[in-house]
């Protein structure tokens, strides 16, 4: 047979669309051409494939070879198609058995020696391959990642020869079997290590319960960064679907993805000099940015006013929708971005306003200019806005009874989050307007209290709705079916900070 078909998959956003590798051998001058809108890296695979076939002691056909990567309108990039192209050439030239090819999907970059090198974005391809009932043949280094998908036969191969021997039934590839780590190793950072700041710790607990965004403002050294780093340790565990989605994004980014920690919530803390592309994602071949890498986890923005204002404004839509869409001239890609934002900032340019040291010499105009670097619409999307004051030296030096550890807080958060999932199927921060009206009803007295707070604090409609969601989370922590005045008052106190006023 002078034609062969091999199955593989491309990568577009978080999706893995099917790619059919068609190889045809015909009479004519010896040549190898690849068609089907391949990128430069795919075109370069011609030389890699030829050398790999020859160094694996197969014959490279001295015929006119046409390789079509279908569908033709789907951009293909990277060396992931090296293995299926090589197998297609060997099958079309009759050197390997073609009967078993339809049962598998193949991925892998070939070294000149025929060894298989790892590729990125294997996990999205593995998820889709399972749904289509095919086994997966991958490089050995990608096996643990692909094996995260249950009910999928993963066959890791170290070399092109091993794949060919498997297809010829002479030496079957062993199925990869690995214990699926739950990824729930104890967090090194414990909330008990933070001295004092009980009000801030309570805000962290409420934020973790409902998935709310949080802004902390206070002088340097008050524990803002410590508190933020401990938020993942009190968040409830991810579901299997959430964990796989998060792991798939890490797989696409290719930044040292560790299958052993696939269930751990991510904590991302980009520097304030990060560009919009670094934060949101982009590039000619769209890659996920920090907000997608923090999907189902925590995105910590320290020194918030130091970020470029235009960069911060790009976060407004993902904060609402939980998705970021990157559009380029040739393609469009969407990545999930349902992250929990935690931001921290100083109260003034020098940072010492209100710390009791009398070191601050900033004028009121300088303070206002500093705080106005963060726009009102962006602040409106942050549910909790609290002050983290400097602690008295005596409180820092005195021995105090052990503070509550992260595990104790986490158990309360898990119980409250279970109430939310049973009620609405999602965290309180993500409920829509209809669900909010249904689940956040107030009695007349609480309604009047909220109206007074709205007038006094000059709240927008979005700010009002976010207070209701926070109050619902506080009520869930108390296992209360109704929002009472105490819950509403605490929710208002967690948002009453006006960072515009020095």
Where are these regions (language model features)?
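Peripheral, non-AAA+ core regions of ATP-driven protein-machinery
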Residues: 1-215, 219-226, 327, 463-464, ...
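Basic, amphipathic alpha-helical bundle interface domains used for macromolecular binding and assembly
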Residues: 35-46, 59-61, 68-78, 285-286, ...
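Short loop/turn elements that form and flank the Walker-type P-loop nucleotide-binding site
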Residues: 60-63, 100-101, 131, 150, ...
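Residues immediately C-terminal
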Residues: 112, 299-300, 306-307, 393
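P-loop NTPase nucleotide-binding/switch module
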Residues: 168-206, 210, 238-291
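Walker A/P-loop
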Residues: 216-256, 321
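Walker B catalytic acidic pair
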Residues: 296, 302-303, 314
């Amino acid at each position: 047979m002078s034609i062969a078909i091999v199955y593989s998959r491309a990568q577009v956003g978080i999706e893995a669309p099917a790619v059919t590798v068609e190889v045809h051998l015909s009479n004519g001058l010896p040549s190898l051409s690849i068609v089907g809108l391949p990128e430069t890296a795919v075109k370069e695979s011609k030389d890699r494939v030829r050398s790999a076939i020859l160094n694996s002691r197969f014959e490279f056909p001295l015929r006119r070879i046409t390789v079509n990567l279908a569908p033709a309108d789907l951009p293909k990039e990277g060396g992931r198609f090296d293995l299926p192209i090589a197998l297609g050439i060997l099958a079309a030239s009759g050197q390997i058995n073609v009967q078993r090819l339809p049962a598998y999907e193949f991925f892998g970059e070939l070294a000149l020696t025929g060894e298989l090198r790892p590729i990125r974005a294997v996990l999205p391809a593995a998820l889709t391959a399972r749904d289509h009932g095919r086994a997966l043949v991958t490089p050995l280094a990608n096996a643990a990642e692909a094996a995260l998908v249950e009910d999928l036969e993963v066959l890791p191969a170290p070399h092109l020869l091993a794949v060919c021997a498997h297809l010829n039934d002479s030496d079957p590839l062993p199925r990869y079997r690995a214990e699926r780590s739950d990824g729930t190793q104890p967090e090194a950072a414990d909330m008990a290590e933070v001295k004092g700041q009980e009000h801030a710790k309570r805000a962290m607990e409420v934020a973790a319960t409902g998935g709310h965004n949080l802004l902390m403002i206070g002088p340097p050294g008050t524990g803002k960064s410590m508190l933020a780093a401990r938020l993942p340790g009190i968040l409830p565990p991810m579901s299997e679907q959430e964990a796989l989605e998060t792991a798939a994004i890490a797989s696409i980014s290719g930044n040292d993805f560790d299958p052993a920690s696939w269930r751990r919530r991510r904590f991302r803390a980009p520097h304030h000099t990060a560009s919009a592309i670094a934060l949101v994602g982009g590039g000619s071949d769209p890659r996920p940015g920090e907000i997608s890498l923090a999907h189902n986890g925590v995105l910590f923005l320290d020194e918030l006013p130091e970020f470029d204002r235009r960069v911060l404004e790009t976060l407004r839509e993902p904060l609402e929708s939980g998705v970021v869409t990157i559009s380029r001239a040739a393609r469009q890609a969407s990545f999930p971005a349902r992250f929990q934002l935690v931001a921290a900032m100083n109260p003034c340019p020098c940072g010492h306003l209100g710390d009791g040291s009398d070191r601050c010499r900033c004028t009121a105009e300088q303070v206002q200019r500093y705080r106005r670097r963060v726009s009102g619409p962006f602040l409106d999307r942050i549910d909790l806005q609290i002050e983290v004051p400097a602690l008295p030296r005596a409180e820092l030096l005195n021995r105090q009874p052990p503070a509550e550890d992260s595990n104790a807080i986490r158990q309360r958060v898990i119980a409250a989050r279970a109430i939310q999932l049973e009620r609405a199927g999602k965290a309180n921060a993500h409920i829509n307007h209809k669900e909010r009206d249904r689940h956040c009803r107030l009695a007349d007295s609480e309604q009047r209290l909220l109206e007074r707070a709205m007038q006094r604090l000059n709240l927008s409609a979005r700010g009002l709705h976010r207070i209701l969601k926070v109050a619902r989370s506080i009520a869930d922590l108390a296992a209360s079916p109704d929002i009472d005045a105490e819950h509403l008052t605490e929710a208002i106190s967690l948002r009453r900070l006006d960072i515009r006023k020095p």
